[in-house]
Amino acid sequence: MAKKRNQRNLKAVQAAKARKKRRNRRRRRAIVLAIEVIILLALSATAFVMAKYDKFQRVEINSDDIKINSGVKKEGYTTVALFGGDSREGELEAGTRTDTIIVVALDHKEGVIRMASIYRDTLLQQDDNTYNKANHAYFSGGPKAAINMLNKNLDLDIQDYATVDFKAMSDVVDMLGGIKIQVTDPEAKMLNKYVGETAKASKKKAHKLNGGGVYTLDGPQAVTYARLRKLEGGDYKRTERQRLVIKKLYEKGIKADIGTLNKIVDKIFPQVSTSFSLKEVLSLAASASSYKLGDSQGFPFEKTDGIIYRTAGDAVVPLGLAENVEELHKFLYPNETKTVSSTVQMISTEISNLTNVVRPANMNTEEETNTDNNSNSNNNNNSNKPVITNSTSDSGNSKSNNNTTGGGTE
């Protein structure tokens, strides 16, 4: 009896071992399958980006041609330039007017993307050391000159850029099903006035709004909204609208299905000019979902406008470029301790001397800085007025022809 019992126990143990072996085998197969799936997905994503990459208008910029001020190096951050071209013809090189100039900083430690719009009429030193409006750099020398202008004046370390034609923005909005935005009565009135022009350039139908309210804007409406300028707040308020549209697109884009994203890529990539290599695009694509969109600002923080400077015409003048750059770095790179370079100090002094605009001694940059929630458009309406020692020295000169004319969107 004991012998039979031992035999049964032995068989039970052997059966248990066999079951365990089968389970381990299945588990190993499952693990291998899971790894294969992950690799397949990764390879698919890589293959997807590689297949689409050649659709970009790729512009290679020699790193030796990029100028970076001495001592400027950003550890833990990647900073890129984003330009919005208004050629509306798909031509995105020199000769293109850039209504939108945005510095985008990726904070790798915190996983945050911060944006700063550079007001297009800001008087800055150009790549050739002359002075003109910020958007003149791209117009006269293309993306390389624009990057160098940003690096030199703002102590940035920008190596790459992307330029998007306005038609591309219209297409993206429509392909994502529109973006929900609250529009004021004055904005609706101006939008209705110019949406036809935008729709015609995009080869789409124009739809007007019924006054102010919350709307799901279509492509032409969203682009027109982002470009409205001749309203209270002028270009300052316009940059806020641009950043809002980008934020709304980002929020919808990260929720889009792969089919929609595929269509967007096929449609949009040909309307994008960039210096990013395939390796860099793959790296950005792989990490994109892990970043959240943070705050945005307009630059310069303290400024005065209506200053006529030679051929630049009616320009926005920073009230102390050096102080504004210091505040910009506090915003874009909060973990960095920054002292502005001697180059920025020199440019800051030159702008003050050339325009006769002096920063008030009692102005505190940090206290004066406003976020989008506090309406950046009102920054220069404060009690610390700029001291203009001689505002008429260049008032008789004609305005530059590098800016578009006419229309509330210009």
Q: In which residue ranges do the predicted regions lie?
A:
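C-terminal solvent-exposed extensions
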Residues: 58, 70, 273-397, 402-410
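Flexible, polar/acidic helix-loop-strand segments at domain edges
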Residues: 74-76, 174-260, 409-410
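Extracytoplasmic
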Residues: 75-78, 96-101, 110-118, 129, ...
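Soluble non-cytosolic domains of exported or imported proteins
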Residues: 97-98, 128, 137-144, 163-167, ...
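Amphipathic, coiled-coil-like alpha-helical scaffolding segments used for oligomerization/assembly
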Residues: 140-204, 277
